Amino acid sequence: PRTLYRRPVETTATATLPRPLRGRRPRGQPPPVQPPIPDDAGKLFSWPLEGTLTSRFGPRNGSFHDGIDIAAPVRSPVRAAAAGRVIFSDDLRGYGKMVILKHANGFTTIYAHHHRNLVKDGQTVQRGDIVGEVGESGRVNGPSLHFEVRSGKTARNPIHYLPSVRHATQSSRSP
């Protein structure tokens, strides 16, 4: 299984850069080293849950899977991937108990299959706030979170908007 680990909020890197000599480097000296950029720099969202990635975005069993599924124990906390406003917190066929957040950047994120929702319509949340608990509501095989990222009505691959994962192995059930 691909196990997700929460990365530190702050990643800093320091490097001592050599001073240029009148715009030229002495012969045989390598170019100045730039500080490394954290691999999650510029990512819009945080992982909503620590768990095992069991299903990816894309074609699946003759249909299209609009998000990713992350397995975790029942009642594990599901966190807001970014600050936003709750525009839906209820039960929806297939998705079970579900929360939808609208973000200032025009994106929405969807969190489904909850044991219970912990936010109400109209509520404002910050990145990392708990919005629900992992469950098995709706059409699902075991306790997990279904997570989607949408731009307008278009589903986007959440992996492209999330920080990279360290020390991960892929589930054999994932395409």
Range-by-range predicted roles:
Residues 41-175:
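Catalytic cores of peptidoglycan-degrading enzymes
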Residues 1-52, 172-175:
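Polar/charged, compositionally biased leader and regulatory segments
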